[in-house]
UniProtKB/Swiss-Prot annotation:
Belongs to the plant globin family. The keyword Transport does not apply. May not function as an oxygen storage or transport protein, but might act as an oxygen sensor or play a role in electron transfer, possibly to a bound oxygen molecule. It comes from Pseudotsuga menziesii. Keywords: Heme, Iron, Metal-binding. This is Non-symbiotic hemoglobin. GO terms for molecular function: metal ion binding. The keyword Heme applies.
Amino acid sequence: VFEIAPSAK
């Protein structure tokens, strides 16, 4: 989870 888009998926 970051701001809007989770770039960990």
